[in-house]
């Protein structure tokens, strides 16, 4: 149990999250396969259940407060896109959640750290843990910090997830992943410009520029798709 607690502690410190105890985060990072293998009761499924409800509440309240002119039906569609499995898997990747997960050997060997369903479930479990440990205000900041840009893009109708589409195409061919890195950053603090590169097996496929790291990565993935640079095509 000591090793599990150390991993949870590292996650909390790396993400600069306040906490009173790391017990809940340890549970949030524990996939059922690990709990079964180690013969422990605590896994992240109950926290996932709670986190799902908290996530929907936080996003719904944010939409209600920031998009007063949109009708109920529009708000429901926006929320659905923002809290779907694909969006939550991106959330998880943006905070490198996969590297902290406690997985059973079978899940580990089959690529569970990169599996969308596992990542999305773990995000919800972490949200549930933060809510129980620190309350609604803290978990609101954690969620909105990661989803605000996606909410804005989705609400404006401009959002298309090029990164997920590219990843799906690559994995369908050879089960590999593409990766992203910021290769240039310029401009003053209030008007930064980022250049991101998208890589496959350490080879640069394309670059993209944006006002945020996420936008630059999306632009890089978009260029790969539009210029037909997908590996294996």
UniProtKB/Swiss-Prot annotation:
UniProt-listed Pfam families: dsrm, Ribonucleas_3_3
Entry's Gene Ontology cellular component terms: cytoplasm
Stored PANTHER family: RIBONUCLEASE 3 (PTHR11207:SF0), RIBONUCLEASE III (PTHR11207)
GO biological process, any: rRNA processing
InterPro entries documented for this protein: dsRBD_dom, RNase_III, RNase_III_dom, RNase_III_sf
EC number(s) recorded for this UniProt protein: 3.1.26.3
Organism: Syntrophomonas wolfei subsp. wolfei (strain DSM 2245B / Goettingen)
Family: Belongs to the ribonuclease III family.
Residue positions of the active site: 52, 124
Presence of the UniProt keyword Disulfide bond in the record: no
Protein's UniProt name: Ribonuclease 3
């Amino acid at each position: 149990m000591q090793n599990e607690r150390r991993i949870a502690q590292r996650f909390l410190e790396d993400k600069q999250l306040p906490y009173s105890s790391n017990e809940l985060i340890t549970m949030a990072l524990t996939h059922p396969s690990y709990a079964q293998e180690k013969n422990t009761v605590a896994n992240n499924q109950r926290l996932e259940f709670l986190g799902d409800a908290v996530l929907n509440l936080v996003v719904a309240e944010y939409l209600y407060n920031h998009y007063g002119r949109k009708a109920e039906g529009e708000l429901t569609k926006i929320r659905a896109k923002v809290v779907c499995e694909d969006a939550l898997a991106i959330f998880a990747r943006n905070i490198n959640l996969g590297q902290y997960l406690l997985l059973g050997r079978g899940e580990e060997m089959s690529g569970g750290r990169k599996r969308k369903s596992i990542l999305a479930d773990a995000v919800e479990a972490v949200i549930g843990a933060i809510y129980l440990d620190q309350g609604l205000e803290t978990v609101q900041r954690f969620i909105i910090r990661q989803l605000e840009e996606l909410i804005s893009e989705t609400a404006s109708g401009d959002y298309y997830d090029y990164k997920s589409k590219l990843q799906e195409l690559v994995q369908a061919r050879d089960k590999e992943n593409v990766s992203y890195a910021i290769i240039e950053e310029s401009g003053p603090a209030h008007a930064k410009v980022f250049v991101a590169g998208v890589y496959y097996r350490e080879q640069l496929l394309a670059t993209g520029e944006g006002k945020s790291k996420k936008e630059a990565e999306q632009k890089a993935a978009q260029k790969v798709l539009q210029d037909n640079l997908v590996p294996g095509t």
